[in-house]
Every structure is written in C-alpha cells, then in structure tokens.
Amino acid sequence: ASGEIFGHDTRISLHLLEITPALKALEGVVMEIEDCAFPLVDEVVITDRAEEAFDGVNWALLVGSKPRGKGMERGDLIRENGPIFVGQGKALGKAAEDVRILVVGNPANTNCLIAMHQAEKEGIPRERFAAMTRLDQNRAQAQLAQKAGVEVGDVTNVTIWGNHSATQYPDAENARINGRPVPEVVGDMGWLRGEFIDTVQQRGAAVIAARGLSSAASAANAALDHVMSMEGTTPEGDWFSAAVPSDGSYGIEEGLVFSFPVRIDGQGGCGIVQGVELGDFALEKIAATTAELQEEKAVVAELLK
C-alpha cells in the first residue's frame, strides 16, 4: 500500500477475506488502513466469500488457518486446516492469470500443497505457489549478525531447508558475511551446528512463551520481504529461501512443497539454486525434515486426489 513493493505508480485494490463471525472486527482493520492515508489504495474489499476475495487478484496471501489448540497433535491440526485450503485452492480459479500465491497459515508447507493441488485443477500452474520460510531466514540472519557483531544486511546466502517447523534446517555453513563464509567469520562450528539451529527452530515457540501470542509483526514483515523478492531480481551471487514445489532437486520428492534456496531472474521466473554443497551433517538434517513433510502429505492424502 505504501509503494515499497510494487512501485510508487502502482495502484492497489486490497481484498480481505475473513470468517463470518470476525467481519465486524475486520471493519476496524479497514478503518486503520484508511487512517494510514496510503496514497495508492484505490479500494478495500472485505468479504467472507473466497471466490469474491480472490476475484482478479495478482497476489494472494493465505494467512488464515486454525491455530493449534492445547493437547492437539500436529496431525490433528493438519486435518483441521486441510479442508480450508481445499476451498481456497478451488476459489483461486477466479484470480488473475498471473496470480502468485504465498501460504503463511500453518502448517504452511502442507497447506500450500493442498491449495496447489486444487488450484492446478483450475488451471493455475504449481510454480505460482510458495509457502513462507522467509521468517525463518530472517531469524537466522539476525542470529548470525548478532553472533558476528555485524549488520543484518551483511549476512547473505542463508538457506532454510525443508519444512516450516521445528525440523527445518537453517543452513549457515553455506551462508556468507561480507562475502566470507560464515564458519570462517564466526569460528565456532559447535555453535553453528547446535545453539544456532536450535534457536531458529524454536524461535516461534519462544515468541509465544514471551508474549502469549504467535509472531505477528515479524511474520507480516517476512511476507512483505517474500513478495518484494519475488517481484524483483535477486542480487548476483545471493539467494533467498522459499518453500516451493520440488522439481526433484537435491533428491527431494517431486511436487513436495519444500524450502530451498531460490533466485528470481527478473522475468518472473523462480528457480531453485543448484550446486549448493551439502555435507553429511546437512544431509541428515534434510532427511529428517523431508520425512516429516512426507508424513504430513500422507495425513492429507485424501485431499490430494
């Protein structure tokens, strides 16, 4: 809405989808958007109908999902949210021909897989879909910057491999700080393979423990970072993380929504970076997160027919 992502000459029509009982509260959100006086916002549409919300959209951010309740197993959460993303995947058939979709609602990778499967039936290519692991990347960059005593912007080539969950593998060994390998700069492989990984994997839980609610501002910021990266051109030599449908790269099952290092070519194409070196430690971590994603896929198998 401010012009920072799509440019200062691009007008914005914002469509907000909410469940019926929460539409009144959504009116308050619209008031706040109006009070921001964004010069590029032409209209704000609020609705509880997915078909209306997705009608003609160029970007769809699927943020809503049922949160995990006390005593609820991850498999139960997946089953609860699956039907939501079946409906949204079908409704995306109303979107613009060039629509891109970012799934934020958890469990993001598998929700993305479900929506992608349904949307493909509506003629939307799977390559338009991604689940968000940019928040995990941002968390990893911040931890590395603090450890090395540098600016966050000095940290590049950070990769999140796999699932947006506690099994994800935050890869610092292929990352760089001011062009130098992170292990060389940090000089502490024990920390990089231990506390660093644990901190990034458990950061969401730590936020909940501290504030009683899940990440909000940082997640919104990461979603904007993702869209901005997708709309731009990736700087030479760098990459960013996104969970995209696998093309078989790195031995990951084709079609599984898996976080890889990716690059944007400036023509709208998103490609998985090839040739990233992975040692035994990394491969073990990647195998664990792959197994979890395959288990999640099995839970929702009926929704993928």
Language model segments and positions:
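Canonical Rossmann dinucleotide-binding motif of NAD(H)/NADP(H)-dependent dehydrogenases/reductases
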Residues: A1-E4, G268
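Redox-cofactor binding/interface segments in oxidoreductases and associated redox assembly factors
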Residues: L61-L62, V103
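Conserved N-terminal Rossmann-fold NAD(P) cofactor-binding segment
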Residues: E4-V57, A298-E302
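Residue-level recognition of the N-termini of beta-strands and the immediately preceding loop/turn
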Residues: T10-H15, V41-V45, V99-R100, R126-F129, ...
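Charged catalytic carboxylate motif
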Residues: A25, I84, A222
